[in-house]
């Protein structure tokens, strides 16, 4: 299911990355000062999206996009196009 879209994007854009896509990370590495957390709710530490100088989770991003196109924390434009850094995996399909 996910491979079809990836192949279409690859055929359309070649090997270069599509422009305007923000990477979504499944797991963030530990830093010197601890874990990365969502700057809005402070609970989520997986599936974070980088805004201008901080990270926000998908739930907070969706709720902010329902209200306005700008981030309530930093005032920058919120990311709308996402791409996965690692391709999600699924069990093999057997009809």
From Swiss-Prot:
Give the protein's function.
Plays a crucial role in virion assembly and budding. Expressed late in the virus life cycle, it acts as an inhibitor of viral transcription and RNA synthesis by interacting with the viral polymerase L. Presumably recruits the NP encapsidated genome to cellular membranes at budding sites via direct interaction with NP. Plays critical roles in the final steps of viral release by interacting with host TSG101, a member of the vacuolar protein-sorting pathway and using other cellular host proteins involved in vesicle formation pathway.
Answer yes or no on keyword Zinc-finger: yes
Source organism (scientific name): Tamiami mammarenavirus (isolate Rat/United States/W 10777/1964) (TAMV)
Q: Lipid attachment of type N-myristoyl glycine occurs at which residues? A: 2
Protein family per UniProt? Belongs to the arenaviridae Z protein family.
Q: How is it modified after translation?
A: Myristoylation is required for the role of RING finger protein Z in assembly and budding.
**Protein name (database record):** RING finger protein Z
Which stretches does the entry tag as region Disordered? Answer: 1-24
HAMAP family per record: ARENA_Z
Task: Provide the transmembrane region boundaries.
Answer: none
Q: Where are the zinc fingers (RING-type)?
A: 38-74
Subunit description: Interacts with protein NP; this interaction probably directs the encapsidated genome to budding sites. Interacts (via RING domain) with polymerase L; this interaction inhibits viral transcription and replication, Z partially blocks the product exit tunnel for the releasing nascent RNA product. Interacts with the glycoprotein complex; this interaction plays a role in virion budding. Interacts with host eIF4E; this interaction results in eIF4E reduced affinity for its substrate, the 5'-m7 G cap structure.
């Amino acid at each position: 299911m996910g491979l079809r879209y990836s192949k279409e994007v690859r055929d359309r854009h070649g090997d270069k990355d599509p422009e305007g896509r923000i990477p979504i990370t499944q797991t963030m590495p530990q830093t010197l000062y601890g874990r990365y957390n969502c700057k809005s709710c402070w609970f989520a530490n997986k599936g974070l999206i980088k805004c201008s100088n901080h990270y926000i989770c998908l739930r907070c991003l969706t709720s902010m996009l329902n209200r306005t196109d700008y981030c309530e924390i930093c005032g920058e434009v919120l990311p709308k196009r996402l791409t996965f850094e690692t391709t999600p995996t699924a069990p093999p399909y057997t009809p």
